Amino acid sequence: MKKRLSELKVGKLAVITEFENDDIFLKLMEMGCIPGETIKIDQIAPLGDPISITVAGYHLSLRLDEAEKIWVEETIISKQH
């Protein structure tokens, strides 16, 4: 089931499926976030912003508004801390 990256909980894994707009796509593509890539939620700040992720072997922080524009398909296997 597709959902926004911002909806995932810490430790969850998902595959990036699409982005809502081209502006965010170019920025994220430069950081290794491309459709088909597996992404893991590492940490969510107490107020929900920013969200720390791991993608393509890199640790990145995304603002909540960026995470809301990324659509993912959650995987069955998740790594819990």
Where are these regions (language model features)?
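Short, charged beta-turn/beta-strand-edge "cap" motif at the junction between a beta-strand
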Residues: 20-21, 43-48, 59
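Short, structured beta-strand/loop micro-motifs enriched in basic residues and often containing a Trp
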Residues: 11-24, 35, 73
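Short, Lys/Arg- and Gly-enriched loop/turn segments at beta-strand edges
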Residues: 26, 46-53
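Conserved beta-strand/loop element in small beta-rich adapter and peptidoglycan-binding domains
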Residues: 34-42
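SH3-family beta-barrel domains
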Residues: 1-18, 78-81
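C-terminal structural segments of small proteins and small subunits
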Residues: 11, 51-81
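Short alpha-helix capping/helix-loop boundary micro-motifs
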Residues: 1-2, 23-27, 38
